[in-house]
């Protein structure tokens, strides 16, 4: 994370007070890079360090990633003559907390991390991105870090934005900061070892972007979604390769296009909050049964029905959306969609969005609007219809 600080100080002699105004420009990069840990790649060694940099690196690696790629990661740093310390961590939503963050801090202290010259490197999925990003933003009040996401959620969602966080008091990401990594390297080769469920999990976030702003991406998922899963975005066929490249770039560009002008969320009408109104509560109450993207898809299915009932979608569009969700291996219903849970979820979201629902609903496929007048009765009716449509979609797929 780089930038220039500008400061102005104004003294008011009549009030015996001073007003300080400061601005800091933030610049960060998201870059596609095949074979990040190939011995000829130096991206990770050139980014994020002030001045002359250092030949030392502290690296946090997800334990599942370490089991598959650990020897290659160690070989990479050894080959380049980097004095490195690797902290291997088991992470997940159930341990996305301050205890996990504290373990990273303790390891950084033990390594003796230099504040500016030795950016922390984070290699793993979205949960690790969030926790380690929070640590980087807090450690000595701000330490640069680099991200190498290894899951689809990480590549197109958690790894490209500025938000960090941990769960607290039963709430998802209740404590967090805005702290983008100086550089995020997106390497689709990591998806080759991702299981089908976690691929589907990430496809939910890709579908979110498609539904709120990219009809062409929706059509791509409609036509080639199953191929993307079968080939794990590795492009084993010409069709699969073209689809994988287009889908990953469209989703990443779409996400950054939405985040960039509103990085600090000064505007709370955020189209990328689609699928994230009810899902935080559902996901936390369902732990560990639902993955993040699965909860998001359940939310999107509900809000698709809300949009249909309000005339924002026609029946054909509604059914196409449900069909794609099902084809991608995503749930469109969950027993937690009760009136009590939906009301609690909406109330918490209203507090998060400063007193208004600011609920994004799809308009057709590829458009979005925001509403503030959804009622409990409307939610209950939509959930009942959603349950029926979910069962119908499963029957059609069978």
From Swiss-Prot:
Keywords: Cobalt, Lyase, Metal-binding, NAD, Nucleotide-binding. The keyword Signal does not apply. The active site is at 163. Its cofactor is NAD(+); Co(2+). SUPFAM superfamilies: Dehydroquinate synthase-like. A divalent metal cation binds at residues 205, 276, 292. This is 2-epi-5-epi-valiolone synthase. Gene3D superfamilies: 3.40.50.1970, Dehydroquinate synthase-like - alpha domain. GO terms for molecular function: 3-dehydroquinate synthase activity; metal ion binding; nucleotide binding. Divalent metal cation such as Co(2+). It catalyses: D-sedoheptulose 7-phosphate = 2-epi-5-epi-valiolone + phosphate. Belongs to the sugar phosphate cyclases superfamily. EEVS family. It holds the Pfam family DHQS_C. Catalyzes the cyclization of D-sedoheptulose 7-phosphate to 2-epi-5-epi-valiolone. Does not use ido-heptulose 7-phosphate and 3-deoxy-arabino-heptulosonate 7-phosphate. Involved in the biosynthesis of the acarviose moiety of the alpha-glucosidase inhibitor acarbose. NAD(+) binds at residues 62, 93-96, 126-130, 150-151, 163, 172, 190-193. One of its GO terms (biological process) is antibiotic biosynthetic process. InterPro entries: Dehydroquinate_synthase, DHQS/DOIS_N, DHQS_C, EEVS-like. The keyword Heme does not apply. It comes from the Bacteria. Its EC number is 4.2.3.152.
